[in-house]
Amino acid sequence: MKKVITYGTFDLFHYGHMKLLERAKNLGDYLIVGLSTDEFNLQKQKKSHHSYEHRKFILETIDLVNEVIPEKNWEQKISDIQKHDIDTFVIGDDWKGKFDFLKEYCEVIYLPRTDGISTTQIKKDMASL
């Protein structure tokens, strides 16, 4: 069984998130999503509209996602890859090159973002209403 992992905040879940998950799942048989905790988001100076538990619930209801694990810090990726026997690490290409160090442990793929939609843009649009 080929296992794939991706990470993200997945706040204000939208079409672009779904396309990322679909493309990630198409690369393997089992998809794990490392979901940023509220505490980790604060460390990154980000604030989610939805709580970790609500974002986790949304992801767990999506058939493409087999498992959701908490992302608590930047450093856990290597241990997650080893613990879950990951074959492929997938993330958006806005992170291109940032996770090349993981190639020692698994395949690393940077997927193109879906044009025209992002959580940041949704938040800006909502703020301007």
From Swiss-Prot:
Major localisation? cytoplasm
GO CC annotations on file: cytoplasm
Subcellular localization, as worded in the UniProt entry: Cytoplasm
Gene transcribed to yield this protein: tarD
The UniProt record lists the keyword Transferase: yes
Sorted keywords for this record are: Cell wall biogenesis/degradation, Cytoplasm, Nucleotidyltransferase, Teichoic acid biosynthesis, Transferase
Q: Name one Pfam family in it.
A: CTP_transf_like
- Catalytic activity annotated for this protein? sn-glycerol 3-phosphate + CTP + H(+) = CDP-glycerol + diphosphate
**SUPFAM superfamilies, sorted:** Nucleotidylyl transferase
- Kindly state a single biological-process term from the GO annotations of this entry: cell wall organization
Output the PANTHER family linked to this UniProt entry: FAD SYNTHASE (PTHR43793:SF1)
Alphabetical list of InterPro entries matching this protein: Archaeal_FAD_synthase, Cyt_trans-like, G3P_cytidylTrfase, Rossmann-like_a/b/a_fold
Which major enzyme category is it? transferase
Q: What is this protein called?
A: Glycerol-3-phosphate cytidylyltransferase
Q: Which domain of life is it from?
A: Bacteria
**Gene Ontology molecular function, alphabetical:** glycerol-3-phosphate cytidylyltransferase activity; metal ion binding
| Function of the protein | Catalyzes the transfer of the cytidylyl group of CTP to sn-glycerol 3-phosphate so the activated glycerol 3-phosphate can be used for teichoic acid synthesis, via incorporation into both the linkage unit by TarB and TarF.
Q: What is its EC number?
A: 2.7.7.39
Q: Write out the similarity annotation.
A: Belongs to the cytidylyltransferase family.
Q: Which organism is it from?
A: Bacillus spizizenii (strain ATCC 23059 / NRRL B-14472 / W23) (Bacillus subtilis subsp. spizizenii)
- Report quaternary structure and partners: Homodimer.
UniProt pathway: Cell wall biogenesis; poly(ribitol phosphate) teichoic acid biosynthesis
Name the residues that bind substrate: 44, 77
Annotated CTP binding lies at 9-10, 14-17, 46, 113-120
